[in-house]
Amino acid sequence: MAGIPEAQQGALIEAMAAHEIAHCWRYVQGVWHELPAGFVEVGEETAQDAELLAASKAMRETRREEGYADLVALAWIQRSHPQDYARVHGWLAKVRGNVAVPRSGHDTRVWVKLAENGEQFGTAATPFEAASTVWREGLLRDE
């Protein structure tokens, strides 16, 4: 939040809170690290070290959860503060654009890009539902 005027921090803090609540929601729903219905892992990774395979799977699962949570955050802002959407999206795109390792746990660029204008969230009953459709689209593009 360095360099962001205090008057503009409120929407960012709400987005961060919504992001964390999305993690809690997925966990409570019993779908933490689960793909949505109809999705399956395809392909087969190989490595001589089983620990590397486990780390790769963990990063992939984390990236998916982070992508979903970023979308819930953006859906929340679109619903609650549409006038701030472009600014919050730009901030998140910048944060996610600075990943040190592509495809690591916090590389959610594919999902953030899909939500560029906020229109894709539509009129779903909750930010969780609004994020789900965009999340699925990102899953198809991410893997």
Where are these regions (language model features)?
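Active-site scaffold of zinc-dependent metalloenzymes
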Residues: M1-E14, I21, Y27
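Catalytic Zn2+-binding segment of zinc metalloproteases
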Residues: E20-A37, Y68, A75-W76, H81
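A structural signal for well-ordered alpha-helical segments within the folded catalytic domains
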Residues: A11-H19, R63-L74
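Residue-identity detector for glutamine
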Residues: Q8-Q9, Q29, Q48, Q78, ...
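Long, well-structured alpha-helical subdomains associated
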Residues: A55-S56, R60-T62, L71-E143
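Post-HEXXH active-site segment of zinc metalloproteases
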Residues: Y27-E66
